């Protein structure tokens, strides 16, 4: 049973987050190990395994990057944990320039405004990549979607770096 089947959801990138959460809570209740305290050793072990499977599946499906990676793996393209290097020099150059720009923001005269504008630009880029990934997955364009997910991981890492700069600047 795959993660989507476990939650009774269609195997697609676009998910109803509230439905996923409610299904998760329902499955958690149903298979909580405490409910099997008086059951046989085998049934208790199965309940623990099922609870772990539910938690793992939820973690994968609630995150758009891991959900896209999972959909790709379900369609024969395994990119989770891969060490493949990015093959798009223009994208890599853009990422380097963005990181350099982020490094300079704290030294500018209006760091708060500059960081907010930079964050908005990167967030827009992130959302555009998500929309493209959704379309590519819907159209079964697996290699293109895989490349886009690789790029999205770079952008997500940049978003995390923005948060770190924000914490340093504003506590």
UniProtKB/Swiss-Prot annotation:
Record domain J: where: 2-74
Gene field: hscB
Pfam assignment, any one: DnaJ
Assigned protein family: Belongs to the HscB family.
Gene Ontology biological-process entries: [2Fe-2S] cluster assembly; protein complex oligomerization; protein folding
Role according to the record: Co-chaperone involved in the maturation of iron-sulfur cluster-containing proteins. Seems to help targeting proteins to be folded toward HscA.
Top-level lineage group: Bacteria
Subunit structure: Interacts with HscA and stimulates its ATPase activity.
InterPro entries associated with the record: DnaJ_domain, HscB, HscB_C_sf, HscB_oligo_C, J_dom_sf
GO-annotated cellular components: iron-sulfur cluster transfer complex
Protein's name in the database: Co-chaperone protein HscB homolog
GO molecular function annotation: ATPase activator activity; protein-folding chaperone binding
Keyword set, alphabetical order: Chaperone
SUPFAM superfamilies: Chaperone J-domain, HSC20 (HSCB), C-terminal oligomerisation domain
């Amino acid at each position: 049973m795959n993660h989507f089947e476990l939650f009774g959801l269609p195997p697609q990138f676009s998910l109803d987050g509230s439905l996923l959460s409610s299904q998760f809570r329902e499955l958690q209740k149903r298979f909580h190990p405490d409910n099997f305290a008086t059951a046989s050793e085998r049934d208790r072990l199965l309940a623990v395994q099922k609870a772990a499977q539910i938690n793992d599946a939820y973690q994968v499906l609630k995150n758009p990057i891991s959900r896209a990676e999972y959909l790709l793996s379900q369609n024969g393209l395994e990119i989770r944990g891969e060490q493949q290097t990015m093959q798009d020099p223009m994208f890599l150059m853009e990422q380097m320039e963005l990181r350099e720009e982020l490094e300079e923001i704290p030294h500018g005269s209006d760091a708060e405004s500059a960081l907010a504008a930079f964050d908005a630009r990167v967030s827009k880029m992130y959302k555009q990549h998500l929309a493209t990934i959704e379309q590519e997955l819907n159209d079964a364009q697996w290699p293109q979607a895989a490349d886009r997910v690789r790029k999205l991981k770079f952008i997500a890492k940049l978003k995390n770096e923005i948060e770190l700069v924000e914490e340093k600047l504003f506590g």
